[in-house]
Each structure stands twice: as structure tokens, then as C-alpha cells.
Amino acid sequence: MNAFKQREVWFAIGSQHLYGPQTLQQVKAHAEQVVDSLNREAGLPVKLVLKPLVTTPDEITALCRDANYQPQCIGILAWLHTFSPAKMWIAGLSVLHKPLLQFHTQFNAQVPWDSMDMDFMNLNQTAHGGREFGFIGARMRQQHSVIAGHWQDPEAHRRIGQWMRVASAKQAGQQLKVARFGDNMREVAVTDGDKVGAQIQFGYSVNAYGIGDLVSVINEVSRGDVDTLIEEYEASYVLSDAAKINGAKRENLTDAARIELGMKRFLEQGNFQAFTTNFEDLHGMKQLPGLAVQRLMQQGYGFGGEGDWKTAALLRILKVMADGLHGGTSFMEDYTYHFQPGNDLVVGSHMLEVCPSIAREPKPLLDIQPLGIGGKADPARLIFSTPAGPAVNASLIDMGDRFRLLVNQVDTVEQPHPLPKLPVARAIWRAQPTLATAAEAWILAGGAHHTVFSQALDADMLRLYAEMHNIEFLLIDQDTTLPAFKNELRWNEAYYQLNRR
């Protein structure tokens, strides 16, 4: 995806002229060394760009305004090397719209016991300079993140990298366009919601298009382009007998390829990065898009079934966040349970649309099987299982007065038995802390049946995403108990009612 290409985080150093030019020169030299080291050795996904030292209110305000207007800048990392009186930051922070991270570090890792003098103390004042900066953020009620630790500490590197990923995802969300092919599945509640409110909160736009608009683009796809794509299928997947040349369903594969090319062309022409479909809106299409949706998700597009635009947008945003990390990220649905004492499991899947980025098999099976839902021809789909490992399920829901991000930590397991008659991709997991507690908590919180499933991301990154957007975050994990979770729901309700703007 190259999600972080041409992105940068501005590294800002705050100080004041009180200390004199020699001290400020040392601060600049230290900053250059820190930024150079972090860019070379910390494995950060986004480049740090050192900005000129800011020592006056006007310089700080100019920096913050410039950050807002430069599209390559996804946020500011601030280091208070010396004491920078925080009233100087009020005007700048008041206009700053990009994410802010305070890196509470200092140049030296240890105190030089034998040589430390007052010059050293004046130069290395992060310990209290950072507190002054933190106060003004708290006083202004401004959302910002804080990471404390030495700049050579791998844990600090990891956390800065996570913050960069979330800041990049936030910017991607602000630029995101979601196309809905058709409307919401009739009478379904949770997939609907306030699209205007979402655009105000997150920045992404959601617009619907008649299925005929898509069909007209699909019908323009040439046979030569279809044949080229089918050659790619044959190189990438294990084709079932029905899908092979002269197979009983070969024409269905041709139709699926034409649908994929048409959908991608439509999305590219409109600069959409996420989309939804609905099996109730298929007029003019030969089959429900399955293979097309799976492959588009693997290329980085967000997707939601049955018109679920919130999950489509969230999937795209989390794919940006996860770019380059080990593990995949997919549209998902809790489909059925396996109740067994000591071994309760959830089978996650969907009618067709599970992203191959989570596939365990190097070459998934490409098959064509009947699908009663939608009333169309048998659709092509990729069939695979998912590797074992930790994962999260995330659901963004509209609570009317606010958005809520609900996350359940799960442990994916290897498929324990063959599923010879199940013609869809799937993931199987143990919900934390138990299936019963996780399901009850999820239902009490109003979590959707659609989720984003990710083996690349963790709950900390999703919590940070929620914090950057000032939305509610609820976590169901190994430490969750139902009485405490119910209390959290009550407390949150009171907080958000009192904090309404």
C-alpha cells in the first residue's frame, strides 16, 4: 500500500532565549543527533523532520499553522529539552489540528554523578520542562499523547512507531471517500447511522451510487482485460475443477473477473478507498461480488457488507495503520459458536467476503459454489483458513450522541477439523476472557455483528485511535468482568452526556 510514503512527522524543540545562544546551540546539536538516530535505527514507519528551534509565541504559532497546511505532515512530536514557558504555546496549540505527541525524553540516559554542574542542569531540563508543557495541554483540554523514556530505548521506539501509524490512519480517514453500491440492507439497524456526524467526527465522506452506475462500468470491461486477470488468478490460486478451463463454472469465473475490473475502475475513477455492497441491490449484475471484494480488500480497500459504511471506513483506516506489519486485516462477522466446556470457539466468516491477507494457505482455493442469498448465479470466492495467533475484533457503532469503538481481544486457533462442505473463508478464535463473558459484554455495549478482524494490530493502537478522535473506547479482554464492564457503560454514559458540545 505504501501508506507512509511521502508522510512525515515534524520534530519540534521548545526552549527560550533565557539560556543564551551557547545553550540553544547545544540543544540544536542534540536534537539533530536524536532525529538522525531515530530515523536510522528506530525502525519508524514515518520519517522525522527536524524543524527549527522554537523560542517565542510567534515561532510556535507559525509552526503549528504550517503543520496544519502541509499535507505531508501527519503530526508534531514535541520535545521540551529545556524549560519552555507554556503560555508561549497557547496560541499555537489553539490552532493545531494535527495529532500531537510529547516525547518526554532527555539527551543523556544517566546522571553523570562526578561531573554534573549547573550548566548541565540548565541544559537538561526535560524532567520539569515537560511538566510545564503537559499542564497547558491539560488546561486547554487538548487531546495529545505522551511517551516517556530515553530516545535510545527500543520500547520508546515501538510506541513512537505506533503513534505514527495511528496518526497516519487518522489522516487517511480525513481524506477517505466511501462508495455505497446500493443502500443499506432493509430493516437492519446497526449498519445504518449518521453519515453527516461521521464526516464531522472522522472526516470521511459516504455517498451512495445506483447499482446501474456500477453495472455500466462493468459492461465496458474488455475481454482482453478479463483474460489477463484470469491468468493472474491461475497463477495466484488453486482453481477447483469447476473454475478451470472447460470447467462447469468457467463462465462464472469470467463474470467474476469482469466484476472485479469494473469495480476497481469505478473506485479509481472516483478516488474511493472503501465501498459497500448489498445482496438486495444487484440488478444487472450476474453474481454477488465475492472474489472481487476479497481481492480489493487485499489491495487495501475497505469493505462492508449489506451497506455497512462504518465498517468499510474502519477497515480502510486500520489497513493503513497496519501497513507493513505482520498479519492481515479483514472484514469479518461472528457467524456461529462451538460450545464445549473448556474449549468454546467462535467461527468467523461471511457469505463470501473475507480478505486473503489473513489466509494461512499460500495459495487459497478459488471455487465457484451456489449461494441462495441474492438470487443470482453462483459466485466465485477464495476459500482459506486463518493462522493461529493473537487478534482483535473492532466495531465502530453510532450511539446517537457519540461514536463508540468496541474491541475484543481474541486468540485465533488453527482450524481443529476439516470443513469439507463449508465453501467460504473463515477464522476461528477463542474470545477473551471467555466466550460467554465476551458475548454478553459485546451485546450489552451494542457491538455490531460486523467487525474488522486484525492479526496485525493490538488494542493499544485502537485505543489511541479513539483518543485521537475523542470518541468512546471499550475493551473486552482477559481482565474483563461483567459487573465492572456494566459500571463502565454507566459511567461512560454519564460522562458523555455531561460532556456534550
From Swiss-Prot:
Transmembrane portions of the chain: none
CDD domains (alphabetical): L-arabinose_isomerase
Keywords: Arabinose catabolism, Carbohydrate metabolism, Isomerase, Manganese, Metal-binding
A single GO molecular function term of this UniProt record: L-arabinose isomerase activity
Gene Ontology cellular component terms for the protein in this record: cytosol
Pfam families: AraA_central, AraA_N, Arabinose_Iso_C
Pathway connected to this protein: Carbohydrate degradation; L-arabinose degradation via L-ribulose; D-xylulose 5-phosphate from L-arabinose (bacterial route): step 1/3
Enzyme Commission (EC) number: 5.3.1.4
Chain positions recorded as Mn(2+) binding sites: 306, 333, 350, 450
Cofactor detail note: Binds 1 Mn(2+) ion per subunit.
Enzyme class: isomerase
One example of a Gene Ontology biological process annotation: L-arabinose catabolic process to xylulose 5-phosphate
Cofactor: Mn(2+)
Quaternary state and interactors: Homohexamer.
PANTHER family, per the entry: L-ARABINOSE ISOMERASE (PTHR38464:SF1)
Family: Belongs to the arabinose isomerase family.
Protein purpose: Catalyzes the conversion of L-arabinose to L-ribulose.
Protein name: L-arabinose isomerase
The organism of origin for this protein: Serratia proteamaculans (strain 568)
